[in-house]
Amino acid sequence: MQPGATTCTEDRIQHALERCLHGLSLSRRSTSWSAGLCLNCWSLQELVSRDPGHFLILLEQILQKTREVQEKGTYDLLAPLALLFYSTVLCTPHFPPDSDLLLKAARTYHRFLTWPVPYCSICQELLTFIDAELKAPGISYQRLVRAEQGLSTRSHRSSTVTVLLLNPVEVQAEFLDVADKLSTPGPSPHSAYITLLLHAFQATFGAHCDLSGLHRRLQSKTLAELEAIFTETAEAQELASGIGDAAEARQWLRTKLQAVGEKAGFPGVLDTAKPGKLRTIPIPVARCYTYSWNQDSFDILQEILLKEQELLQPEILDDEEDEDEEDEEEDLDADGHCAERDSVLSTGSAASHASTLSLASSQASGPTLSRQLLTSFVSGLSDGVDSGYMEDIEESAYERPRRPGGHERRGHRRPGQKFNRIYKLFKSTSQMVLRRDSRSLEGSPDSGPPLRRAGSLCSPLDSPTLPPSRAQGSRSLPQPKLSPQLPGWLLAPASRHQRRRPFLSGDEDPKASTLRVVVFGSDRISGKVVRAYSNLRRLENNRPLLTRFFKLQFFYVPVKRSRGTGTPTSPAPRSQTPPLPTDAPRHPGPAELGAAPWEESTNDISHYLGMLDPWYERNVLGLMHLPPEVLCQSLKAEPRPLEGSPAQLPILADMLLYYCRFAARPVLLQVYQTELTFITGEKTTEIFIHSLELGHSAATRAIKASGPGSKRLGIDGDREAVPLTLQIIYSKGAISGRSRWSNMEKLCTSVNLSKACRQQEELDSSTEALTLNLTEVVKRQTPKSKKGFNQISTSQIKVDKVQIIGSNSCPFAVCLDQDERKILQSVIRCEVSPCYKPEKSSLCPPPQRPSYPPAPATPDLCSLLCLPIMTFSGALP
């Protein structure tokens, strides 16, 4: 072969790579068609995975393309190439000892550290990834699969859980079928251990590892034996990744794994003299849970705590072990006061104490807890523990940072520390009971008047109402049915030393467990997501539960909203409804929810994310343009080289997993709030993220949402609608930070506010803006024998704040985020502004020791409330 000549395989891989990058440059907006481009990345992965040698060819071409990007300064192609390089290295079975691919990659990506954010941070993370792979081959694959399968070791207990939230009424049946396949039970722990061990030994020894022989010997091992071998292997890889010299680390790891193999009884299959054949070991399907979701709250996520309690319980117990020695002296000093408070619990029944002690002993012996014990334990504490009250935070209002030597003292525990944890649980519970009783004796009212919950045209009338005290103490929509199912160690108050995991921070612990929340829907669903996110923040601020164990990541998959027919849908097939435990909360199915003749919702939020991140537009937003039958097809089943290999998934499932695994940078979407005044004088505050419709457009949506009754009511257009006289006061923001207020009175049929996110030019603005669309009546003709007829004109104004007031208290309707369940009637005043986080939180830790020189005093600043949606590269400049 002549120098510079390429083989047919190299040409095919190069062509597939070019197709992946097609249309991602600065001129991508001029592309007239984009259907099918989302399959290019999936096609490239399928082509490369057919032969282990293809991965090295693709990596060479990615590096060559990356060097061209640096020479030409093509910013838009760097992030996709970096993601392709990362995913390809992750799936590469083995790098030959004489290969310098990773070293060349490190030199190539090191040159991009001078580029602006986020390009430099992407390359910095990629360099860290390359350094770990040079020292411990395959360690990133091991960490990913270990977390997704929930396989913990002594020093690494992090896990990753994926939750799919779909509304069966709005999502096509094919999507539900794919979600059902993803949520089916994955590989058993025995099979997962075998997969990880095969990958670890092949990544280290390469073709000199007899993979078939090793697979047979691993299958003959018991689960306990596999767990012991895997623990030693994982610990060896982690230790090797911390060695300074890469060559020394690889040699040490090779020697260590060979010793592990000899100890396990299969020395003949490792480091064989005769090289064999490499095998591609695909990434197993991640653990997924699928739920039917159409609420304004994320209370359903608490079920994950119940399902994952075996993994989460050691984590919280370890945190308490680090704090026991610090608390012993304080507990001994406070014994006199605690004895008086514990006397309050003595008035309870003896059965409650017995159930509590039996639960504590069962926790010490093992993670398996019977549901009867859980229920009795929670019922015994239900008088003193509440999950949504502001007063509950007093127990954990003051936090102290951990001592630096906390981890070193873990091995020197005293015998009585296990009992101290139970004692502190009694102590905290009795203190809450005393505080509650003292408040009831004093007769002090709750802080603040009750808020009027926004009425809904479609909300059920037979839903149970909350007690007045809860309605005043919490503005969320809790579901108390789930609490009795959670173990007591989850419902117990957080330790005052417990570090609360932030919702969004660049300094999060990489070893923490991750909860991926994947939501399917249109702009209507994005409104539900932001309301649920706001409620979750409020609840977790008052009483951390989910954020004690998980860092939350939100993923958004746009789908076209299916039109209803006006008649109830037929019962869902069996495959569309994932089986749930008999004691789990029941979720309504499509037949129960019914289908209304809804208008087709827009997908502006997903288009906005696509404009910020072209790789999101290509691989996530592009899925919406393909028919479901194409996305839900699978490849032809091929003979599996190894028994236990994962089955072929539909294309949509592969792309969803790709999105969840490699989208690591959030885009912050601004949230807006509206303060509504009703004709009765009551006020309420609601939030939205995409649109607010006012007047005739909201009333029309309400009529269409009424189902068959809409035919009787009739629907008129803006030309036949009765106009409203509205006073509109708006503010136009400027880059300088100054705002100019304008006041006008208009005769309108509709006033719509929407996020300015539809055009590429709007991304260049440094100020967040809303588009105010006015449907103004220029002239109204009212003939005696016919309906009134309006001559209308439309206009648009960019605003950041606006007040709309009905003249002479004229009422109008308001709809939030195109949601038929969030239509509010009889509104006379509407004020819209960006939503801010609470100024102060009682859960903030006490101030640290002042720095020297002391920082100048600054006033309290309120940060904007934003919804973080995960994308591949974040917002590109």
From Swiss-Prot:
Region (Interaction with beta-gamma G protein dimers): 650-750
Regulation: Greatly activated by G gamma proteins.
Family annotation (InterPro entries): PIK3R5/6
Membrane topology category: Peripheral membrane protein
Regions of compositional bias (Low complexity) in chain numbering: 476-487
MF GO annotations: 1-phosphatidylinositol-3-kinase regulator activity; G-protein beta/gamma-subunit complex binding
Disulphide bonds in the chain: none
Phosphoserine: residues bearing it: S456, S505
GO CC aspect terms: cytoplasm; membrane; nucleus; phosphatidylinositol 3-kinase complex; phosphatidylinositol 3-kinase complex, class IB; plasma membrane
Localization per record: Nucleus; Cytoplasm; Cell membrane
Start-end of Acidic residues biased regions: 318-333
Residue numbers bearing the N-acetylmethionine modification: M1
Gene Ontology terms: biological process: G protein-coupled receptor signaling pathway; phosphatidylinositol 3-kinase/protein kinase B signal transduction; positive regulation of MAP kinase activity; positive regulation of phosphatidylinositol 3-kinase/protein kinase B signal transduction
Keywords linked to the UniProt accession: Acetylation, Cell membrane, Cytoplasm, Membrane, Nucleus, Phosphoprotein
First-listed, main subcellular location of the protein, grouped into a coarse class: nucleus
Basic and acidic residues bias spans: 397-408
Region (Disordered): 318-337, 394-421, 433-488, 563-597
Region named Heterodimerization: 25-101
Segments of skewed composition (Polar residues): 564-575
Subunit annotation: Heterodimer of a catalytic subunit (PIK3CG/p120) and a regulatory (PIK3R5a/p101) subunit. Interacts with beta-gamma G protein dimers.
Protein function: Regulatory subunit of the PI3K gamma complex. Required for recruitment of the catalytic subunit to the plasma membrane via interaction with beta-gamma G protein dimers. Required for G protein-mediated activation of PIK3CG.
UniProt note: domains: The heterodimerization region allows the binding to the catalytic subunit.
Listed name of the protein: Phosphoinositide 3-kinase regulatory subunit 5
Species for this entry: Sus scrofa
Gene name of this polypeptide: PIK3R5
